[in-house]
């Protein structure tokens, strides 16, 4: 099992796309949050969904989003989970895999802001101030700790093609995955 972490807009989804092309099954913790938020009638606005995620963590524990996402795991050996936000979530995923590997994706705030604006998801931020607010919220959840403890770090500071190549190299060399899958 590979669990991916990184600040918003760092490139986690792109890492997952490469992993999927190599035969991994992908799960997205953010999709789980958005699904539960929608069912609770929460508007598709970044700070509303973020507040909902925080509220659920306070009610049910810091690992609640891991608990809810893990229900969808079908093959722990070939699963990539996108969106690790804290150590408690990592501990929970350890129940499904003896040694889940943490891959952290890093990109500058400037690059992340530009990418977020381009992807144009309905619940995304629209201003630098909103990104700073979101970064602060995610840091309060403990994301900095899991980034610091990552087994592998990929820097996303170049073209998309270069980043994909870095992802493919890590997956094929460290996880013995064939480039031909």
Swiss-Prot record:
Binding, ATP: 6-13
The reply on keyword Nucleotide-binding is yes
What is the top-level taxon of the source organism?
A: Archaea
Q: Which GO terms describe its molecular function?
A: ATP binding
Which Gene3D superfamilies does the UniProt entry name for this protein?
Answer: P-loop containing nucleotide triphosphate hydrolases
Alphabetic keyword roster: ATP-binding, Nucleotide-binding
Q: Which family does it belong to?
A: Belongs to the UPF0200 family.
Q: What is this protein called?
A: UPF0200 protein Ta0179
Originating organism: Thermoplasma acidophilum (strain ATCC 25905 / DSM 1728 / JCM 9062 / NBRC 15155 / AMRC-C165)
The taxonomy runs: Archaea, Methanobacteriati, Thermoplasmatota, Thermoplasmata, Thermoplasmatales
